[in-house]
Amino acid sequence: MTTQLEQAWELAKQRFAAVGIDVEEALRQLDRLPVSMHCWQGDDVAGFENPEGSLTGGIQSTGNYPGKARNATELRADLEQALRLIPGPKRLNLHAIYLESDTPVARDQIKPEHFKNWVEWAKANRLGLDFNPTCFSHPLSADGFTLSHPDAKIRQFWIDHCKASRRVSAYFGEQLGTPSVMNIWIPDGMKDITVDHLAPRQRLLEALDEVISEKFDPAHHIDAVESKLFGIGAESYTVGSNEFYMGYATSRQTALCLDAGHFHPTEVISDKISAAMLYVPRLLLHVSRPVRWDSDHVVLLDDETQAIASEIVRHNLFDRVHIGLDFFDVSINRVAAWVIGTRNMKKALLRALLEPTDQLRQLEASGDYTARLALLEEQKSLPWQAVWEMYCQRHDTPVGSQWLDSVRAYEKEILSKRR
């Protein structure tokens, strides 16, 4: 440990103690908050089922940065490189298309055995796993409908895929000793004016009820459902709207997924957390950065990321909110994208833990909004970065931007040789 880092740490402890904050306790709390990294940043949401196929479902990965992972071995190696550069607890979020098999496997036939390599890898890296059925990039989703499809046979295919995915998710939780959160997102919707808004939603309701009919131990598996405002090709009507899934999660007591990019640009999910928590048992967050639409840019340490973290900490939602990331930027180094986004999420959580929330609540309750604003702003200038650097040091991860040297070396030695 450098003398400079030690000195900064000691000064930071004193500064935060002056406002009633125990920085050691803040770091202990930070170690209770895993962030689930998404595997699909590493290969542009291609997966291993049909890596050369088109990405569909109204989503896009844009850019042409070299070094994309081409198989599971490369993807796991890239993830390991990123994991080494991120302090504290992590998880990994997988999609169904990241299965491994020597022969083609239909999506409604996926089994735990197709993910055993991921489980063994997760054990070796002390990670929990989360899961998602993949209801896009498939011939049977080409017309824009899956679980709400008017054709009963196609609809059943997607129901069976989601049911099979839940068994995989439960397998993850059983094997790893930590529940897998399985999130259902579907692209279903229409490009232009839609006459019958009700029938597709009725079909989706019934399909979801069938999907979740098999019971699993909540210590192994947690169901979540995710809404979206619109997607490319589904600008006018989305079957799985916010109101639909809020009602579904409330009535069925599943987790509700809030994605930062899935709402109108003037809406923020940080303000939705406290409202939703009054009705649903759990929330899954997909922290992302929408630029004018659901563009899935890399997460920044910006106002909304901070607000999301502050909501979790201020309301002590550690055991009810699951933090996941969802972005895929192909214009920059993919390993760096993971590191930047995940470290930023963790920085936001730390800053929230270093806030004198009790004092701020008292000021708010007494109507002293002047002091509330003053303290909130002064808090931003306190030396939280010295606490972050100590956290990195204790977890044997690089301090500051030193991690970029490791990424550059990995790019030169490994990524640049991929064609």
Swiss-Prot record:
Transmembrane parts of this sequence: none
Endpoints of the signal sequence: none
EC nos: 5.3.1.14
Assembly behavior: Homotetramer.
Lineage: Bacteria, Pseudomonadati, Pseudomonadota, Gammaproteobacteria, Enterobacterales
Disulphide connectivity of cysteines: none
Cofactor: record remark: Binds 1 Mn(2+) ion per subunit.
InterPro entries according to UniProt: L-rhamnose_isomerase, Rhamnose_isomerase, Xyl_isomerase-like_sf
Coiled-coil intervals, chain numbering: none
Names of required cofactors: Mn(2+)
GO function terms (MF aspect): L-rhamnose isomerase activity; manganese ion binding
Gene designation per UniProt: rhaA
Keywords: Cytoplasm, Isomerase, Manganese, Metal-binding, Rhamnose metabolism
Gene Ontology biological process terms, A to Z: L-lyxose metabolic process; rhamnose catabolic process
Subcellular localization(s) per the UniProt record: Cytoplasm
Domain of life: Bacteria
Alphabetized Pfam families for the sequence: RhaA
Gene Ontology cellular component list: cytoplasm
The name this protein goes by in its record: L-rhamnose isomerase
Binding site for Mn(2+): H262, D294, D296
Catalyzed chemical reaction(s): L-rhamnopyranose = L-rhamnulose
